[in-house]
């Protein structure tokens, strides 16, 4: 058993030792803190030094970069506009039959006709899409391209699936007649101009609206001032030498022998072939355009008929009609 006096002295001695140790620890902290603070200050100063010039340089570099970006954007926009303006149109190859090639004496033997088609923007309204475009047509003659200016109108994108010469002739007839009748509406004497369109129908005894064929021939007393391609595309097919009928245009059509698919089967029989040739005679018919559509016009009595059967059965029929 220890006495309370010894225990009190021990506790007092421990407290004194602790009090002596505490100042030593404080001194170490005081000594270590100055050594740590300069490092922190140096790092902070170096970071601030490194950051301040960097911010200045980044601000200085941002200005030319923004200017360069704006210049690149403007150049890209200009290039896109120039590409849209200088965009080459599409090429459409249209085969030409030999009968039409023979008329092109000044161009020689042409292989095909290239028509430049304009790309149509579907976002634009129809009024803007249906405008006339003046482009060029390339006629390849003897491997030498010859440029011809043509004028055409496009409303929508289209294809031309040519199968035979019959479809080509019917297309030419439709295009020319539509162009002529549109010009005739501007004239005062429209009936006189419309009556100049004479068509000779093939096989009148077995005529149907689905089977007919026509061939263009040169009108009489007519002088051609321009080549065939330019006349067909510009709307002025020919010009008459008669000064009284100034700027009156005519398209004369002749009949040809057309044999249907049913009649082809009877060609092996001689009698059937003779019957086809026997009834193949020329019959002149005048077709005019009215507000109600196409009509058959009788040049003798001046009456109009809706069908060819009515024209044949009326009272003033004759072998030459």
Swiss-Prot record:
<protein>
    <recommendedName>
        <fullName>CPX chromosomal region candidate gene 1 protein homolog</fullName>
    </recommendedName>
</protein>
<feature type="region of interest" description="Disordered">
    <location>
        <begin position="1"/>
        <end position="83"/>
    </location>
</feature>
<dbReference type="InterPro" id="IPR013087">
    <property type="entry name" value="Znf_C2H2_type"/>
</dbReference>
<feature type="compositionally biased region" description="Polar residues">
    <location>
        <begin position="21"/>
        <end position="32"/>
    </location>
</feature>
<feature type="compositionally biased region" description="Polar residues">
    <location>
        <begin position="44"/>
        <end position="60"/>
    </location>
</feature>
């Amino acid at each position: 058993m220890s006495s309370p006096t010894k225990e009190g002295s021990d506790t007092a001695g421990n407290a004194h030792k602790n009090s002596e140790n505490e100042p030593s620890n404080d001194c170490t902290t005081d000594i270590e803190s100055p050594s740590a603070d300069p490092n922190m200050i140096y790092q902070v100063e170096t970071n601030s030094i490194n950051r301040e010039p960097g911010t200045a340089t980044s601000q200085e570099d941002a200005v030319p970069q923004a200017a360069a970006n704006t210049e690149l954007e403007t150049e890209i926009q200009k290039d896109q506009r120039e590409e849209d303006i200088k965009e080459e149109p599409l090429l459409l190859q249209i085969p030409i039959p030999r009968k039409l090639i023979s008329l092109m004496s000044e161009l020689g033997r042409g292989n095909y006709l290239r028509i430049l088609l304009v790309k149509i923007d579907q976002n634009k309204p129809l009024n803007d899409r249906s405008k006339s475009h003046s482009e060029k047509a390339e006629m390849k003659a003897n491997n030498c391209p010859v440029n011809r200016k043509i004028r055409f109108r496009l409303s929508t994108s289209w294809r031309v699936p040519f199968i035979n010469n019959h479809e080509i002739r019917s297309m030419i007839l439709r295009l020319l007649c539509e162009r002529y009748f549109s010009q005739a509406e501007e004239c005062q004497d429209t009936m006189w101009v419309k009556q100049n369109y004479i068509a000779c129908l093939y096989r009148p005894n077995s005529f149907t609206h689905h089977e007919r064929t026509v061939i263009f021939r040169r009108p009489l007393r007519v002088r051609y001032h321009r080549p065939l391609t330019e006349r067909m595309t510009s709307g002025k097919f020919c010009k008459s030498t008669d000064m009284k009928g100034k700027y009156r245009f005519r398209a004369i059509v002749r009949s040809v022998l057309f044999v249907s698919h049913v009649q082809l089967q009877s060609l092996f029989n001689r009698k059937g072939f003779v019957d086809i040739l026997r009834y193949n005679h020329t019959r002149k018919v005048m077709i005019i355009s009215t507000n109600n559509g196409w009509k058959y016009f009788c040049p003798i009595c001046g009456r109009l008929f809706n069908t060819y059967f009515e024209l044949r059965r009326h009272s003033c029929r004759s072998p030459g009609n």
